[in-house]
């Protein structure tokens, strides 16, 4: 039988219940007949209150009428001064608005998100207005609750779940948590109560007013079990008590519940902001948090078992692919990444799905499918509940309700609707299973169980095939001993039962991967300090235990580099970077570092300097890890590694200068002369490896600061200082930001001794003084240093002035003999002080025939021949300087190529030793050919 024919019967049935007053409103339109046939709930209320139908006819429901709920309800309560009248009006208001919402959603006068918002705002209005009315009455009876300073204290109500997310369904419980800001006592009452007593009594009254069944029904079923300690806990808690609870005892399911928590009725008031900020760190962790996957998986398993136990069939909320699974999917990403991606910290499921698509955490097709299924199921759920105002998500088993739903959902019959429901839920179930999985294990169980015995019992596996074939019996025994020592170290740490469970699940998987490596013992000895450092921070253990990809990368990178192992140990936040192998081994474009850092810093409030310092360090460490991973994988050749490290440093310098500038301008205003010039009148010049595009993994930054500012200029702020003093303090601030040690360490070590007159000179020089010094006072070694100098930060005007000074200085005519002698003597001093004394070793940098010799040759040639060939001053890096020497025939092309080849070869070895955290010293018989090329050129240019 079609839904239309059944509807005619339902209309006939509904008419039989009509009251005399309702019949007086006949004739009824076709739409009205359909509505009466659909909803016995609405029919019953219109039978008793036929004037509600008159109001619908005169002012049909519209999508934004939720904006009037508060004013309408307050007007009706103007003269109410007792609880009985309050309860009656609240119930009547609730029923009338639900009838209007039922009409609106049945005829699709507004879409599903709008319906959910109307239902949520209705509940919020009823709760908040009732609370305010009762608060006034309680204050009259017991006085006003105040803090120690006499400031009145409000009751704040956290709406949880769908109410908090503005996604409430038609017939729903409401989950609430009550809180108040500070302890104290009431003032102005007949007798004094402490605030806890006052708010407990207020909370009890509010629950009664909303929840109690009267002749008019009820407003909402109130559930307070989500509060701290559940039913055994106090009904109301102070902010401090709440914070203590969630920091010390908050559980995973409570984090899940708090994702949608929203302060009802007063989101913009000061106490609401305080409460939200207090709860945010509990819900959203600063690191990527994988612990939630297993927790949500366990919760889903519990729900599934309950569904089976209670024989729930066709449940569109709790069944496979139902509404709850869509909520789980979005909240997985919110809880895992919400601390790092503030856009995910939304109460709205649909908003979060859009962000998930934007961040490419799921494909656009998957998020679109989830949104489509969600809206379909939520409309179905609301229609189902509006039939009889019953809190149910189970599809009906009677023909009448099946016909009602099929008609309202736009289907000809139940079978077509049911088929569509199954298709929508099946699509959700596939995505849910791929993301969260089932609570079972099937991966290499036999091998892992062997290593489980090794970990738990200290017994080596019987089969040697589980180890790399190159590992001897002694190696395997040493692995066993390393694990024993590791277990002893762990026993001295504070680690709870959950942490032990995760570690016991992780270690067999880790050992199964490590023991297949030829350097298994070395890798294990590098990884165990990392594990020891995070063993009390269960989330990181869960990250490796949960993600096989992360675990694989940890083993691979620790195998390749102790430097990376040490970085991960010192800064476990870097484990987050291993989640995406595509980005881990995909170099950023060189010009993208500044924009990437800018976007990274958008997550941090500009005024929070401490967080920004931490963010800068975390960004640097994450990018260093990526560059090192790309270096190890052979994605980047050695020269490109230095390019990336240099561009990274430049991006950070720009960010630090801007942060320091903002700080100074807030205190003193800008130097007044900037009104007549573009830019900041300030420059940062990079020397040494930074200037020469040759930074290594642990290089310092050699910086010189310049300014362009006339004498006797003041700043424009309320607190004025001399502008040159401003620039001096700016440079000091920059160095402070670089060198401050936070929990993530120092950003860079900064060396400013290459400035004019060295440590005895001014920290910041005017560009004019710099020009004068370079041309008239600087030593030859300072001109050598100037060759490798380039401006890292500065406006166009300063850039041109610096470039002119550098070019003119390097092009000065020099006595060739004197120059050669001074460069040679400086090089000899360096060899005496820095080169190793053992004849059987070779320092890649300091020994004769090493990198420094190549640098001195290039620098000598620039100083010697730039007067003749001014174009030789163009570049600051050694490779391109040597290319210029060949181009202008200062040296033969063959000599330039051999020096370049030697330079790149030695630099490559230097990088690999840095990754292994080894000194830049090799055996004396290494790189003989390259050293001979260098010594031959050195003898030709510096020793003749």
Curated annotation (Swiss-Prot):
Residues 448-944 are annotated as: Adenylyl transferase. Pfam families: GlnD_UR_UTase, GlnE. It comes from the Bacteria. GO terms for cellular component: cytosol. GO terms for molecular function: [glutamate-ammonia-ligase] adenylyltransferase activity; [glutamine synthetase]-adenylyl-L-tyrosine phosphorylase activity; ATP binding; magnesium ion binding. Residues 1-440 are annotated as: Adenylyl removase. Its EC number is 2.7.7.89, 2.7.7.42. Signal peptide: none annotated. The keyword Methyltransferase does not apply. Disulfide bonds: none annotated. Keywords: ATP-binding, Magnesium, Multifunctional enzyme, Nucleotide-binding, Nucleotidyltransferase, Transferase. PANTHER family: BIFUNCTIONAL GLUTAMINE SYNTHETASE ADENYLYLTRANSFERASE_ADENYLYL-REMOVING ENZYME (PTHR30621:SF0), GLUTAMINE SYNTHETASE ADENYLYLTRANSFERASE (PTHR30621). NCBIfam families: PRK11072.1. This is Bifunctional glutamine synthetase adenylyltransferase/adenylyl-removing enzyme. It comes from Proteus mirabilis (strain HI4320).
């Amino acid at each position: 039988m079609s839904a239309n024919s059944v509807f005619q019967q339902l209309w006939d049935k509904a008419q039989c219940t009509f009251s005399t007053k309702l019949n007086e409103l006949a004739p009824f339109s076709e739409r009205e007949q359909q509505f009466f046939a659909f909803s016995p709930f609405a029919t019953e209320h219109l039978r008793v209150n036929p004037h509600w139908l008159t109001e619908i006819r005169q002012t049909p429901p519209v999508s934004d009428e939720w904006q009037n709920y508060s004013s309408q309800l307050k007007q009706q309560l103007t003269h109410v001064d007792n609880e009985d009248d309050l309860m009656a009006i609240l119930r009547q208001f609730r029923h009338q608005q639900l009838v209007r919402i039922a009409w609106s959603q049945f005829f699709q006068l507004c879409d599903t998100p709008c319906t959910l918002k109307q239902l949520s705002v209705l509940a919020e209005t009823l709760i908040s207005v009732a609370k305010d009315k009762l608060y006034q009455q309680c204050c009259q009876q017991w006085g006003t609750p105040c803090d120690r300073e006499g400031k009145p204290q409000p009751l704040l109500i956290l709406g949880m779940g769908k109410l908090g997310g503005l996604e409430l369904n038609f017939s729903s419980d409401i989950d609430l948590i009550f809180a108040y800001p500070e302890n104290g006592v009431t003032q102005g009452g007949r007798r004094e109560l402490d605030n806890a007593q006052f708010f407990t009594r207020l909370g009890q009254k509010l629950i009664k007013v909303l929840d109690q069944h009267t002749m008019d029904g009820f407003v909402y079923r109130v559930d307070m079990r989500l509060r701290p300690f559940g039913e055994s806990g106090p009904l109301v808690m102070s902010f401090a008590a709440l914070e203590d609870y969630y920091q010390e005892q908050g559980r995973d399911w409570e984090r899940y519940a708090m994702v949608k928590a929203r302060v009802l009725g007063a989101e913009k008031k000061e106490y609401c902001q305080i409460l939200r900020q207090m709860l945010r760190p509990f819900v959203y962790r600063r690191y990527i948090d994988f612990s939630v996957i297993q927790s949500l998986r366990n919760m889903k398993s519990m729900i599934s078992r309950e569904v089976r136990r209670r024989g729930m069939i066709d449940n569109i909320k709790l069944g496979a692919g139902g509404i709850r699974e869509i909520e789980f999917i979005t909240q997985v990403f919110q809880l895992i990444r919400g601390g790092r991606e503030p856009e995910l910290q939304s109460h709205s499921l649909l908003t979060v799905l859009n962000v998930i698509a934007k961040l490419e955490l799921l494909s656009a097709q998957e998020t679109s499918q989830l949104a489509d299924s969600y809206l379909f199921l939520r409309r179905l759920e609301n229609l189902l509940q509006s039939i009889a105002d019953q809190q149910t998500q189970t599809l009906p088993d009677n023909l009448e309700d099946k016909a009602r739903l099929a008609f309202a959902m736009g289907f000809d019959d139940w079978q077509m609707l049911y088929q569509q429901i199954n298709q929508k839920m099946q699509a959700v179930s596939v995505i849910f299973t791929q993301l969260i999985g089932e609570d079972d294990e099937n991966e290499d169980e036999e091998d892992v169980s062997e290593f489980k015995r090794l970990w738990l019992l200290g017994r080596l596996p019987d089969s040697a095939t589980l180890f790399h074939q190159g590992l001897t019996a002694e190696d395997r025994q040493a692995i066993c001993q390393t694990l024993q020592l590791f277990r002893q170290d762990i026993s001295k740490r504070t680690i709870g039962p959950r942490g032990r469970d995760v570690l016991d699940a992780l270690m067999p998987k880790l050992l199964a991967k490590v023991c297949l490596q030829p350097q298994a013992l070395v890798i294990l000895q590098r990884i165990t300090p990392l594990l020891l450092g995070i063993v009390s921070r269960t989330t990181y253990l869960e990250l490796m235990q949960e993600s096989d990809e992360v675990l694989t990368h940890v083993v691979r990178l620790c195998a390749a580099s102790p430097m990376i192992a040490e970085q991960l140990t010192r800064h476990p936040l870097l484990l987050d970077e291993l989640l995406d192998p595509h980005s881990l081994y995909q170099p950023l474009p060189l010009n993208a570092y500044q924009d990437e850092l800018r976007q990274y810093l958008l997550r941090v409030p500009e005024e929070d300097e401490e967080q920004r310092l931490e963010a800068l360090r975390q960004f640097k460490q994450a990018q260093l890890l990526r560059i090192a991973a790309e270096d190890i994988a052979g994605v980047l050749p050695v020269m490109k590694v230095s390019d990336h490290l240099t561009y990274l440093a430049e991006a950070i310098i720009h960010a630090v200068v801007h942060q320091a500038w903002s700080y100074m301008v807030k205190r003193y205003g800008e130097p007044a002369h900037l009104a007549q010039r573009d830019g900041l009148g300030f420059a940062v010049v990079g020397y040494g490896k930074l200037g020469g595009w040759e930074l290594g993994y642990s290089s310092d930054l050699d910086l010189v600061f310049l300014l362009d500012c006339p004498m006797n200029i003041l700043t424009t702020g309320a607190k004025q200082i001399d502008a040159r003093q401003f620039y001096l303090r700016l440079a000091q601030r920059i160095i402070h930001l670089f060198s401050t040690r936070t929990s993530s360490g120092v950003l860079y070590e900064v060396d400013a001794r290459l400035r004019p007159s060295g440590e005895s000179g001014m920290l910041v020089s005017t560009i004019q003084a710099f020009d004068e010094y370079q041309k008239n006072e600087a030593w030859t070694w300072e001109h050598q240093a100037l060759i490798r100098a380039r401006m890292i930060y500065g406006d166009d005007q300063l850039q041109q002035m610096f470039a002119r000074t550098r070019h003119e200085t390097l092009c000065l005519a020099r006595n060739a003999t004197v120059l050669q002698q001074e460069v040679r003597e400086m090089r000899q001093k360096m060899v005496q002080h820095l080169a190793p004394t053992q004849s059987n070793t070779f320092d890649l940098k300091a020994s004769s025939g090493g990198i420094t010799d190549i640098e001195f040759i290039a620098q000598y040639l620039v100083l010697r021949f730039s007067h003749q060939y001014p174009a030789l001053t163009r570049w600051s890096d050694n490779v391109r300087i040597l290319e210029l020497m060949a181009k202008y025939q200062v040296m033969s092309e063959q000599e330039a190529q051999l020096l370049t080849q030697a330079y790149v070869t030695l630099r490559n070895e230097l990088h690999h030793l840095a990754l292994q955290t080894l000194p830049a010293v090799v055996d004396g018989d290494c790189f003989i050919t390259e050293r001979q090329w260098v010594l031959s050129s050195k003898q030709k240019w510096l020793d003749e």
